[in-house]
């Protein structure tokens, strides 16, 4: 949205576009990458780390075994306007086999856990990337998003909170969309300042369709 506004409504030289959304005003910035492509970044609104769940509770809902889930960090709900569950997995094989079962999820939904599930692991398709992920959500059945900005933002807060990396400042490349044949790359920057998570999510814009109203 911000890229379209900058290209067609605002000045193309604008360094920042601010989007007024339900969660508040979201700043979006633009920068050139090393390969001369343009990266678009949004700054996440404040996030809340909520209730946690167990591998035993979640494994069946994803068609996995308990041994597929990385129990070094909890399964946790993260919120910023919308909410999603962050689920750490041990392997890319487990990631590929993941599939959200809404019937099995009904008990968790009754406990207040949203049927929006972001699964990730440390194994990647390409060595220059850091994590691989999938995002499932309910929409007349189960759908899968090929690139999820808010999911990546939630992940950033989660990784900082649980000290998944030794540094308090993160710069991470996340693969997504391979299972739906739309491979995507999502960039994540995150840092802690006191008790506050500062998270930005970026990616390349690739125009695919253009129309004209007559």
Task: Label the predicted regions.
Residues 1-214:
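Active-site proximal loop and beta-alpha junction motif in alpha/beta enzyme cores
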């Amino acid at each position: 949205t911000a890229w379209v506004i900058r290209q067609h409504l605002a000045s193309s030289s604008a360094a920042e576009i601010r989007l007024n959304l339900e969660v508040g005003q979201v700043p979006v910035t633009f920068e050139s990458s090393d390969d001369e492509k343009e990266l678009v970044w949004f700054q996440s609104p404040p996030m809340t780390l909520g209730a946690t769940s167990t591998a035993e509770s979640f494994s069946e809902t994803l068609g996995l075994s308990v041994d597929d889930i990385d129990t070094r960090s909890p399964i946790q709900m993260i919120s910023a306007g919308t909410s999603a569950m962050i689920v750490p997995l041990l392997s890319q094989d487990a990631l590929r086999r993941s599939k959200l079962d809404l019937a099995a999820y009904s008990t968790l939904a009754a406990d207040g856990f949203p049927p929006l599930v972001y699964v990730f692991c440390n194994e990647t398709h390409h060595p220059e990337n850091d994590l691989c992920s999938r995002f499932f959500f309910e929409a007349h059945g189960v759908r899968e998003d090929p690139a999820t900005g808010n999911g990546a933002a939630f992940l950033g807060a989660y990784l900082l909170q649980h000290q998944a990396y030794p540094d308090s400042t993160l710069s991470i490349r996340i693969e997504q969309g391979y299972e739906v044949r739309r491979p995507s790359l999502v960039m994540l920057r995150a840092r802690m300042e006191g008790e506050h998570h500062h998270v930005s999510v970026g990616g390349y814009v690739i125009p695919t369709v253009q129309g004209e109203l007559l």
